[in-house]
Each structure stands twice: as structure tokens, then as C-alpha cells.
From Swiss-Prot:
Protein name, per record: Mediator of RNA polymerase II transcription subunit 33A
Family according to the record: Belongs to the Mediator complex subunit 33 family.
InterPro entries named in the record: MED33A/B
Keywords for this protein: Nucleus, Phenylpropanoid metabolism, Repressor, Transcription, Transcription regulation
């Protein structure tokens, strides 16, 4: 026995081992003696120091079999940790394997024996200490650039290190390591104390060494395959693939290199190249939502996903209509002329396309094709639109031929690498080539046939060797062409893509793109013909040139730049001419350059201060004529929608505010003369600018917008403050946003106007009016002080508008405290007051109130009221906005008595009221909505609230011409909103009066009136939603079609296109045109959820026969019966969920989606009310419900938040709402709460939800709380969803890797 204190315990160990080695002591006896010594010295076992002593003793002076047996015995008795020993040997043996082949062979045997029983080596209290020792030995923190003491993380790194080192050794031994991208392997670094010289006793055994080396290489490769095949090891490696992507990519490349080039592998009896490559494939170490690989996920997969195969099956065989339904809905929704959006359609659709690609597991080819087909369907739905003040074909063509190509360009340019961008361009090419297989969608509307033919002609001329790029191609006569040059929508799309540099002219040579080539090219046109090319060369902007350029869109950015330069720097007449041209065809039909046209027009509204400008007045005054031309030129419904689609509304509003502020400060005596001889005053410029500004926010909507709880009505945030806030956000730069072509363009436009943030406070006069407008909405008029400037303005306006009436009667302004004298009224009635426009707008509410009060008391006839108000609006057209504001507030207050529309005092609707009501009923009936109370007939007289009667009487005094269009476009939607909010039948009465005025608008007016039915009858909303589901799913023979899909949902527009009858209105169109007026959007979303739940049962009953349904009940996942029927049913379930999510998102926006996910869905799961059915649904139907709900919730979230983290605000909201929902699920899985729904529904929902997140939205998983992830994974494990639980934990990142490793180790094999 060694005397304590004289020598260390490790000296004793070495001495004991040396004596045992010399005497050939049995390893068991050596181990027993060693154990006694260690206990004497109180050494804690297993001991890392002991392992280091023994390995150092072996390497290399005592590299003999008996000492290796000693080491093996110490490992068996857990005197040393096998993992520590393997780490030490990896550090000592592998780098010297060329000279220590026998030791290397023993190392491989020990590795094989211990790695596959790794669970046995980490159980116990010393787990963390052992792994820290392993990490120190192998320097894992340096290799993985991660300093951690979590044993699970260290275990994963250890496993990856051991397998990777073995792989590098095999590659090196075969001379293949130099062929890999990382030829200097970090795993083969030589040990610091390694002996270089080989023992002399092996020098004579070169032949046997070479044979042993060959066998060792084969064994190493076979061992690598066994590691990849082993469930526990492979799962641990999967954590590396999820969290160390670059290192895993290198590892995979090296295995592929080994599998494809190894000569030793050819001599293996148990492994071949194909097997090895299969073991490292993405099908085992990856996840995909692509149904094409689902069938390959068998028992050998690392991640089998369980129920995810059912989700992938949803995509199998699904039509484009079902996959891309949200695109069609968003495209059609953007055509609503009652709504402008502060967010660019390019940004919205780019995010939507990425979302649907991920959710559907689609390729970029399919994504691009889905975009093109949805865009073409949008155009085809309105080939012959009805007449009315609504967006027409120009807006739809803008979406199809400009916005969608810009979206595609955005998606391509988001590629981080040139190779990725090139692949995206290839997918674009193939999608456009496939588009040629849809001739029905490609037929151009009549108004663009000429443009399509010219696009085809351009391709033919190019292929024939002609160069028309610099000639007046825009005025070539198609009759001069010797071959048929008929074009279609694809030719226009290709030209739009070429203009954005995402295609080149090689597209012209695609098979079937054009009809052929020509041998004779038409002669060049004479130089004197006015066209864009001659203008660019310096031709003057005379009348002939302007007339030509207005009717023909520019073909290049250079042409627009030249025009913009003239508009800014030219003479006054040239500025007006250039602005006129910009507002022409280049705006409405210049699809290849439309984004630049919109940009230049917006910039023209913020012209620069001339360098030598020194006047006291604002420099905008000098641009009055040009500004007025632009404002009037972009004021049409289509033009405003085009600006909205391009995201220019915030900057447009910001540019209009200083114009309003400045010109509203001048009296009408300030005027200018246009080249045509027409005079315009400051009032005209102000009124046109002010009217356009008001169209950009929800000015024309009801003043009281009801939300539920803290959920605002959709769009209620569209205020001047909000528009400026969005505009100011464009000034903020970031690396991610700067890569976005659209965002960069919006930023440049904003900075061109001002590099500083702009606020409402910057415009004090506008702010005063805006606050008055808000006060008028909130309370009755008050505060008019006798003798004040406002009171004096009111008196002057009353004298001007009602002077003749006041000559004999009293007309009092509100709260004036006096009776107005009538003495001089008649003398002053023809005198026009000279007040600034802002002063008049302050007085208008009091003028209208006084007039309305006088009419109530009989001092003013209805005709005189309407005439006076029209005079006021003619005097200052902008006053119409304040009149609208006043009437809106007064109608909502409901304090005015109704008046009889009898044709004597007020206009009568009797002539066609019954016809209007009959048509409304027919429209609803053909859409599948039956409301008996709307049947025509009845003897009650037609009445309207006094303010509404006055309002409609005022509007019908306007002529329906271009001059009045921009003002009617402001008053019309407000009139409809007010009438819709009044008791029925106010809206039919208003529609009847207007159809008498504008007979050609009959279809539009009747359809508008039919939309308002849903505001008065909640059951009608439910019926319409039910019909949307039935039409989309094709579950019944609806008037439209029983085929289902987009065609049945959205049809072909709306209106009575047939003489003497009404064509059915598609339910989706009717819903999209009315939902914005719905106030309780939360309850609507609940109805949509209810319809989704019930539609699943309808799908099962329609798509699965009763016999198959019974068979499917008894067989898990229906794996033996009715595969085709089940696949069809699953496709329909996805379609129903997609429709539901889209409608909820559109109807309620972010607020309602948050309520749905946070409150509504959990409440549904907790509910136990099954009174509506005698017994619960079958297990299959219950599972289908779970699938539907999972897809519905994920798509709702994805539509609202996006699939990435571009917006920090969106990320925060997603974390909060999704986190709350998952915490609810975790609480249920932990047994803290109990759900009341069917177990099959609950389990399928959770499995489906997690499957969709991990396969389609991995970024979401990284944001989930660690404890929630643990609860979810434990719940999945209890249900046998082990692999899904592993994937979930792996995506949690480093924060869950420790738990994930422990989870994997302790799973049942």
C-alpha cells in the first residue's frame, strides 16, 4: 500500500498498471486493485484524470494489447467515462492512425461499442461534468464558436465531432479530402504531445499495415453509415442540421464526395454508394411540405412528421384555383373604388405570394404561374364593365401588367445570391411559357387589342432582323405588316417583364410565341410624324405633339425623364403641356413604365424652389397652372386607384397638403390664364387639391364606426395623421428594406419632396379645419360668436346663397344670438364675398345648419335649399366636402324629422322605386340570399331624414360630366354610406332618385343598393357567406356553378349584362363589395369559423360515400380504403380553410385575426355544446376538422404577419398573439385545463398546427417560449408524434437544444 502524502494517486495508478502489464495480470484483478486505491484516495468516479493518465500511458510507449484491455475494463466498471475516453482517443489516435493502425482499429471498435449505447453513458449525476471534460478535450467551443456548459448541447457537438472526424479520416485515407471545399480539416489537427516517429517494430510489416489500413478505412465508412442509420445518433445529428446549417452543409458535401468517389466502399460487403447517399439525403435530414416527397418518407426517415403527410396531401392534385384563391380575392378586393390603400399593392402581393408559396409548399414556377393566372382572371372578369363611378378596366390592367410584374421583380431581386436569382428567372420563363396553354385567359379586351398586336409585331420584327427600338414604333400601322401579328395578353406581360429587366428578348423565340417571321420590313416613318422618339430628339411640345403623346404611352424611362425635365424647367406653357401628357395614356396604359409615371406625377406636386426665387409668396403659386393640370388629370376613379396600387397615396397626400394650405389662403381674385384661354382662380386650384386629398382617407365613411372591444373597424386608421406616418416611415433606411425595389422607390419619391418628417401640425389651417370636422362629427354645432370673423363670413355666405329668400324672411345662423336683418339682403345677394377658402370652410357648417333649420320651419323651400347649397358649392367647390361632413354628422345623430319624397316639396322616387326594389330582390335571389321582407310593394309613403333628403337633392343638381366627376366621386360614396346607415328603404329611395338622373348608371346604382341590405339584416350576411362556401366548394347547384373554385366564387363581375334580365352576381363579388361597411366584424369572423366547421362535415358527406366513411373510421388515416376520395376531401378541406382565412383577414384585418387566434379558437375548443347533433362526428370527420382548423389558423396568421421578420412590429405582434395561443395549448397538454371538443379534432389540430409551422414557417418557431415548446413536444410524444416533437424542438434553436438532446436520448427506440 502506498504511503499517503509521498506520491500522488496518479503515480500509484501508473505503477500499478506497469506492474500488472509486466506480470500479465488479469484485467479484472487490475481493475479491482485500482478501484481500491481510488477509494482510498477518495477519487470521485468516473474520473476524467484517470482516463487521461491511462490514455497517456498507452500513447505510445505502452501501446500493447493488455493495456488496452485494462482501459476497456476501466470503462466497463465506469471508473472512467467512455465518452471521455473516446474524446481522448479521438484527440490522440485519429491524427496518428497512419502509423498506429492497430490502435486506430481498437479505437473504431471502442467507438462502435460505446456510441450506440450513449444513453447508458450519460445517466447519472456526473453527466454535466463528463460533457464539460469532453468539451475541453476536443475544444468544442472553438470548433462551434459557442461557449456553453449545457450538457445536451455539448453532447450534440460531441456526436457531430466524432462522426465528422471519422468522415475526414476516411476521405484523407483515400486521398479525397483535397477535393472537398474544406480540404484543411479542423477535425484532424495533430495532438500537442503526439509522437511523430513510428515504432520500429512495424517497419517490417508494411504489407500487413497497408491491408490493415484498407480494412480500417472500410470499417470507418461502414461505421459512419451505422451512425447515420442509428435512430438516436441520427436524431442528434438532425439538431446540428437545424442549428448549424453551414457546418452541416459541409458535412453533407463530404459524405456525398465519399459516397461517389470512395474505392474502399466498393469492397464493403454490407454497404454501397447508393445506401450511403440515401442516408444523408434531405428526405431524412430535412423537412418539406412538398407532396412529391411525402411518399418517400418511410420508416427510415429521421423526420417522418406523422400527420404532416396528410397536410402535404392537401396539395396533391389541387387545382390552381384552390392553391391561389387568396390571390384572386386580394386582386379583386383591390378593385373596390370606395377604398384607397396606404400600403402598396406590390408590398401586399409580394408578401402574400411568399406566404402562399410556403404554406402550399409550391415551387417558384408554380408561384409565378399562380400570380399570372390570378392577374389574367382579374381582367377577364370585367371585359365589359357596367357604367358608373367605379374603377374600370384601366385599374385591372394596371394590376395585371404593371403591379404583378413588379411583384415578380421584387421576388427575384430578394434572392441573396446570383445563382438563386438566376434560378428564379428560369422559373419565371417556364411559368410564362406554360401560360401559353391558357388561350381563354390570354384573349385581350377590345381596348388593348392594338397594344397586344404591337407587342407581337415587335417580336416578329426583332426575329426578322428589324430594329424599331429608335423609330416611331407606336404609330406603325398594323395593316402594313405582311403577316398576321395578332397578339394576346401574354405578349403584353412579356413586354412588361422585359421592361423591368427580369426577361430578355430571347423570349421572342419561344415556341409558339409569334406566328412567324417576315422578309420585308416596313419603311421607316417620315420624320415629320409626331411621336415620342421625335420629342426625345428635340421636337417642340406643340399642340399636335401633345395630342399624340397624350394618346400614346411612353415606351421608355428616358422619354418620361425628358418629359419631367420639361415639366419642371420649361416655360409655363411647356410645363402645362408636359403635365398634360404625363396624365394621359402613359398613366393609364403605360404599363411598362407606369410606376415611373406615377412617381413623376407625384414629384410634380412638390416642385422645387427655383434657384433665383426671391418673392414673398410661396413658390407653389408660380406653378399654379401646372399643379392644377396634374391634380385634375389624376383625379379620376381609375387614376386614384392606380396611385393607390403603386403605394403613392401617403406621399400624394403629403404633397397635396401644402398646396391646400397655400392656395386656401388666397381669395378668388387671384387667378391665372391657361394657354387655352380658360381662367382658373385660387379657389379652383384649392378645391381640386382639397377634394382629391379627402378621397385619400376615410372622409366619406359614416362618422360613427363601431368596433368590438379594442378592435377597430378595418380602415378606420386611414386618417391624415396615419397617411403622414406611413409617408415618414419611407424616410427610415435599413439593410433589408433597401433591397426592396418598391420600398426604395417610395423612399426616393418621399425624399425628393422633403427629407424631413411631415406632420399635420406643419399645416395649421388644414389642422384647424380637420379639428372642426371632427368636432362636427362628435357634437352639434356651437360656439359661433356674434360679430366674430366666422360670423361675418356666415352672414356674407347666407346673403350670397339665400339672399332673395332673406329679403322677406329671417334665416339665422346657429347660436348667433341675433336675428339677421333683411334690409340690405336683396341688394347684396349678387355680390360674391372675397374670403380665403379656409375662412369659407369654417363658416359652411353654420350656413348649412341655418339653411336646414329654416327649411324645417318652412322659411326655406326644399328647392330653394338645394339651389342655395348648389350655389355655395359652385362658388367654392371645396365647400361640398364640408357640406358632406355636416350632413353625415346630422344623419347619424337622428334628430331631424323625416320628410315626404312626394314630388311636390321633395323629388319623388315613385317613378321607378318598385323597379329598383324588384331588381335588388332579384340580385340577392340569384346570389342565393333570400330576404322575404324586401319584397316590393307596400303603401307607405317614401320618406328620408331631412339631412339625407337635402343631400340627395343637392347631388342630383350636378351634371354628369367630366367637370363634375371629381366632386360627385367625393359626394357619391358618402351619400351611399349615409343612406345605407338609415332605416330601409332609404337606400332604394336614393337609388331610385339617382337612376332617374343617370339612367345609364342603373346597373351600378341597383347593385350598390343591394349591398346595403346586409347592413340591416345579419341573416343576409350569414346566407351570403354560406353561399360563398357552397359556390367555392361546389357542394350544391347554385345559380352560378356547381363546379366550385374561383370561377364560382367570383364569377364574371356583376350587373345586368343581358337585355331584359339580370345575370347572377357571384357571391364573392357581392361580399367583397359590401364587407367594409360591416361594423361587428368579430361576429362575422365567428360566423366564418362556424361555416368552416360545418363545411367539413358537408365535404365528408359529399366526397365520401357512407360505405367508405364507415371503412375509413376503422382504419387509421384511411390507409387501406378510399385513398382517392380521402385525397379529394382533404383538398376540399384545405380550400374551405383557405377561403375562411382569406375572408377573415380581409374583413377584420389584424385586430380581428388577433381576437380569433387569442380568444375565439380557444373558446371553441373549450366549448362542450353539442346540442345541434345527436352524436359526435365520426373520427374521420373530427380529424378533418382538426386539419381544417390548423390550416385556417396558420394561414390567418401568415396572411396577417407574413412568413418572415421584415417588420419588427409584425414580429412583436406575432410573438404575443401566437405565444398566447400556444400557451393555451400547452396548458391543456399539461392538464391545467380540459378541452370539450372531440379528442380526434384536438389531437389532429395540434399535430397539424405544429406540422405546418415547422415545415412552412420555421421562423415562427424560433420566437416561441422555451417552456411552451417543451410542453408541446411532451404532448406530441404522448401521442406517438416523436419525430414531429424533435423537429419542433430543433427549430427552437440553441435555447432548446439541451432539452432536445435529452428528449431524444430518452425516447423509446
Amino acid at each position: 500500500m502506498v504511503v499517503p502524502g509521498r506520491r500522488t494517486v496518479w503515480d500509484c495508478v501508473i505503477e500499478l498498471t506497469k506492474m500488472a502489464q509486466e506480470n500479465c495480470v488479469d484485467p479484472r484483478l487490475w481493475a479491482s486493485q485500482l478501484s481500491s486505491n481510488l477509494k482510498f484516495f477518495a477519487v470521485e468516479l468516473p474520473s476524467t484524470e484517470l482516463a487521461e493518465v491511462i490514455v497517456s500511458y498507452i500513447c505510445w510507449d505502452n501501446n500493447v494489447p493488455i493495456v488496452w484491455k485494462f482501459l476497456e475494463r476501466a470503462m466497463a466498471l465506469k471508473l472512467v467515462s467512455p465518452l471521455v475516453v473516446l474524446a481522448l482517443l479521438a484527440d490522440r489516435v485519429v491524427p496518428t492512425r497512419s502509423t498506429q493502425q492497430a490502435a486506430y482499429r481498437i479505437y473504431l471498435e471502442l467507438l462502435k461499442r460505446n456510441m450506440f449505447t450513449i444513453k447508458d453513458h450519460i445517466s447519472g449525476p456526473h453527466y454535466q461534468k463528463v460533457m464539460i471534460s469532453v468539451s475541453n478535450i476536443l475544444r468544442l467551443s472553438e470548433l462551434f464558436d459557442l461557449d456553453t456548459s449545457k450538457p445536451g448541447v455539448l453532447l450534440v457537438e460531441f456526436v457531430f465531432k466524432m462522426v465528422s472526424q471519422l468522415l475526414d479520416a476516411a476521405l484523407s485515407d483515400e486521398g479525397l479530402l483535397e477535393l472537398s471545399q474544406d480540404s484543411s480539416s479542423q477535425w484532424l489537427v495533430k495532438s500537442q504531445d503526439m509522437e511523430i516517429d513510428a515504432p520500429e517494430r512495424y517497419n517490417e510489416k508494411t504489407g500487413s499495415l497497408e491491408k490493415l489500413q484498407s480494412l480500417n478505412t472500410i470499417m470507418a465508412i461502414e461505421l459512419i453509415a451505422e451512425f447515420l442509420r442509428n435512430t438516436v445518433i441520427a436524431r442528434l445529428l438532425y439538431l446540428v442540421s437545424s442549428n448549424r446549417a453551414s457546418k452541416w452543409h459541409e458535412f453533407v458535401q463530404k459524405v456525398q464526395l465519399l459516397g461517389e468517389n470512395s474505392s474502399a466502399l466498393k469492397h464493403s460487403k454490407v454497404l454501397n454508394s447508393g445506401d450511403l447517399l440515401q442516408l444523408i439525403s434531405n428526405r431524412r435530414f430535412g423537412y418539406s411540405y412538398d407532396s412529391k416527397v411525402t411518399s418517400a418518407r418511410k420508416s427510415n426517415a429521421i423526420v417522418d412528421f406523422g400527420s404532416l403527410s396528410s397536410y402535404a396531401g392537401l396539395c396533391h392534385g389541387a387545382s390552381l384555383s384552390s392553391l391561389w384563391l387568396p390571390l384572386d380575392l386580394v386582386f379583386e378586393d383591390a378593385m373596390d373604388g370606395y377604398q384607397v390603400n396606404p400600403t402598396s399593392a406590390i408590398e401586399i402581393i409580394t408578401g402574400l405570394a411568399k406566404t402562399l408559396k410556403e404554406i402550399n409548399g409550391s415551387t417558384w414556377h408554380d408561384t409565378f404561374l399562380g400570380l399570372w393566372i390570378a392577374a389574367l382572371r382579374l381582367v377577364q372578369r370585367e371585359r365589359d364593365p357596367i357604367e358608373g363611378p367605379i374603377p374600370r378596366l384601366d385599374t385591372r390592367l394596371c394590376m395585371s401588367l404593371c403591379i404583378v410584374p413588379l411583384v415578380v421583380a421584387n421576388l427575384i431581386e430578394e434572392g441573396k445570391y446570383e445563382s438563386v436569382m438566376e434560378k428564379l428567372r428560369d422559373d419565371l420563363v417556364t411559368s410564362l411559357q406554360v401560360l401559353g396553354d391558357f388561350p381563354g385567359l390570354l384573349a385581350p379586351p377590345k381596348c388593348v387589342v392594338s397594344a397586344a398586336n404591337k407587342a407581337a409585331t415587335k417580336a416578329i420584327l426583332f426575329l426578322s432582323g428589324g430594329n424599331v427600338g429608335k423609330s416611331c414604333f407606336d404609330v406603325i400601322n398594323m395593316k402594313d405588316m405582311p403577316v398576321n401579328c395578332s397578339g394576346n395578353m401574354r405578349h403584353l406581360i412579356v413586354e412588361a417583364c422585359i421592361a423591368r429587366n427580369i426577361l430578355d428578348m430571347s423570349a421572342y423565340s419561344w415556341p409558339g410565341y409569334v406566328n412567324g417571321r417576315i422578309n420585308q420590313i416596313p419603311q421607316s416613318l417620315p420624320n415629320e410624324v409626331p411621336c415620342w422618339s421625335s420629342f426625345v430628339k428635340g421636337a417642340p411640345l406643340n399642340a399636335a405633339m401633345v395630342n399624340t403623346l397624350v394618346s400614346v404611352p411612353a415606351s421608355s424611362l428616358a422619354e418620361l425623364e425628358k418629359l419631367f425635365e420639361v415639366a419642371v424647367k420649361g416655360s409655363d406653357d411647356e410645363k402645362i403641356s408636359a403635365a398634360t401628357v404625363l396624365c394621359g395614356a402613359s398613366l393609364t396604359r403605360g404599363w411598362n413604365i407606369q410606376e415611373h409615371t406615377v412617381e413623376y406625377l407625384t414629384r410634380l406636386l412638390s416642385p422645387p424652389v427655383p434657384a433665383d426665387y426671391s418673392r414673398a409668396e410661396n413658390h407653389l403659386i408660380g406653378y399654379a397652372c401646372m399643379l392644377n393640370v396634374v391634380i385634375v388629370g389624376i383625379g379620376s376613379v381609375d387614376s386614384i386607384q392606380i396611385f393607390s396600387l403603386h403605394g403613392m397615396v401617403p406621399q400624394l397626400a403629403c404633397s397635396l397638403m401644402p398646396i391646400c394650405e397655400e392656395f386656401g389662403s388666397y381669395t378668388p381674385s387671384v387667378s391665372w390664364t391657361l394657354p387655352s384661354g380658360e381662367a382658373i382662380s385660387a379657389y379652383s386650384v384649392f378645391s381640386n387639391a382639397f377634394t382629391l386629398l379627402l378621397k385619400l382617407w376615410r372622409f366619406n365613411h359614416p362618422p360613427i364606426e363601431h368596433g368590438v372591444g379594442d378592435v377597430p373597424t378595418v380602415g378606420s386608421q386611414l386618417t391624415p395623421e396615419h397617411l403622414l406616418s406611413v409617408r415618414n416611415s419611407y424616410l427610415v433606411s435599413s439593410e433589408i428594406l433597401d433591397r426592396d425595389r418598391n420600398r426604395k422607390r417610395l423612399s426616393e419619391v418621399a425624399r425628393a419632396a422633403s427629407c424631413q418628417p411631415v406632420f399635420v401640425d406643419s399645416f395649421p389651417k388644414l389642422k384647424v379645419w380637420y379639428r372642426q370636422h371632427q368636432r362636427c362629427i362628435a357634437a352639434t354645432l356651437s360656439g359661433l360668436t356674434h360679430g366674430s370673423p366666422v360670423h361675418q363670413t356666415v352672414e356674407a355666405l347666407l346673403n350670397m346663397t339665400f339672399g332673395k329668400v332673406r329679403g322677406s324672411q329671417t334665416l339665422n345662423p346657429v347660436n348667433s344670438g341675433t336675428s339677421s336683418s333683411s334690409g340690405a339682403a336683396s341688394e347684396d345677394s349678387n355680390i360674391r364675398p372675397e374670403f380665403p377658402a379656409w375662412d369659407i370652410l369654417k363658416a359652411v357648417p353654420y350656413v348649412v345648419d341655418a339653411a336646414l333649420t329654416a327649411c324645417t320651419h318652412g322659411r326655406l323651400s326644399p328647392r330653394q335649399l338645394a339651389t342655395g347649397l348648389k350655389d355655395l358649392a359652385d362658388f367654392l367647390p371645396a365647400s361640398l366636402a364640408t357640406i358632406v361632413s355636416y350632413f353625415s354628422a346630422e344623419v347619424s345623430r337622428g334628430v331631424w324629422k323625416p320628410v315626404f319624397m312626394n314630388g311636390v316639396d321633395w323629388p319623388s322616387p315613385a317613378t321607378n322605386l318598385s323597379t329598383v326594389e324588384e331588381y335588388i330582390t332579384k340580385i340577392l335571389a340569384t346570389t342565393g340570399v333570400d330576404i322575404p321582407s324586401l319584397a316590393p310593394g307596400g303603401s307607405s309613403p317614401a320618406t328620408l331624414p331631412l339631412p339625407l333628403a337635402a343631400f340627395v337633392s343637392l347631388t342630383i343638381t350636378y351634371k354628369i360630366d367630366k367637370a363634375s366627376e371629381r366632386f360627385l366621386n367625393l359626394a357619391g360614396p358618402a351619400l351611399e354610406c349615409l343612406a345605407a346607415g338609415c332605416p330601409w328603404p332609404c337606400m332604394p329611395i336614393v337609388a331610385s332618385l339617382w337612376t332617374q338622373k343617370a339612367k345609364r348608371w342603373f346597373d351600378f346604382l341597383v347593385f350598390s343598393a343591394s349591398r346595403t341590405v346586409f347592413l340591416h339584416n345579419q341573416d343576409a350576411v350569414i346566407q351570403l357567406l354560406r353561399n360563398c362556401f357552397s359556390a367555392t366548394l361546389g357542394l350544391n347547384a347554385a345559380p352560378m356553378s356547381n363546379d366550385g373554385g374561383v370561377g364560382a366564387l367570383l364569377g364574371h363581375g356583376f350587373g345586368s349584362h343581358f337585355y331584359g334580365g339580370i345575370s347572377p352576381v357571384a357571391p364573392g363579388i357581392l361580399y367583397l363589395r359590401m364587407y367594409r361597411a360591416l361594423r361587428d366584424t368579430v361576429s362575422v369572423s365567428e360566423e366564418i369559423l362556424s361555416l368552416l366547421i360545418h363545411s367539413v362535415e358537408d365535404i365528408a358527406q359529399n366526397r365520401l360515400s357512407k360505405e367508405k366513411l364507415e371503412k375509413l373510421k376503422t382504419v387509421k388515416n384511411g390507409s387501406r380504403y378510399g385513398q382517392s376520395s380521402l385525397a379529394t376531401a382533404m383538398t376540399q378541406v384545405k380550400l374551405a380553410a383557405s377561403l375562411s382565412a382569406s375572408l377573415v383577414w380581409l374583413t377584420g384585418g389584424l385586430g380581428v385575426v388577433h381576437v380569433l387566434i387569442k380568444e375565439t379558437i380557444p373558446s371553441w375548443f373549450l366549448s362542450t355544446d353539442k346540442s345541434d347533433r345527436e352524436q359526435g362526428p365520426s373520427d374521420l370527420v373530427a380529424e378533418l376538422r382538426g386539419h381544417a382548423l390548423a390550416y385556417f389558423v396558420v394561414l390567418c396568421g401568415a396572411l396577417t404577419w407574413g412568413v418572415d421578420s421584415r417588420s419588427s412590429a409584425s414580429k412583436r405582434r406575432r410573438q404575443a398573439i401566437l405565444g398566447s395561443h400556444l400557451e393555451f395549448i400547452a396548458s391543456a397538454l399539461d392538464g391545467k385545463i380540459s378541452v370539450g371538443c372531440e379528442t380526434a379534432t384536438w389531437r389532429t389540430y395540434i399535430s397539424g398546427l405544429v406540422s405546418l409551422m415547422v415545415s412552412c414557417l420555421p421562423l415562427w418557431v424560433t420566437e416561441i417560449d422555451t417552456e411552451v415548446l417543451k410542453s408541446l413536444s411532451n404532448g406530441l410524444r404522448k401521442w406517438g408524434k416523436d419525430e414531429l416533437a424533435i423537429v419542433l424542438l430543433s427549430l427552437g434553436g440553441l435555447k432548446t437544444m439541451d432539452y432536445a438532446a435529452d428528449f431524444i436520448i430518452h425516447l423509446r427506440s
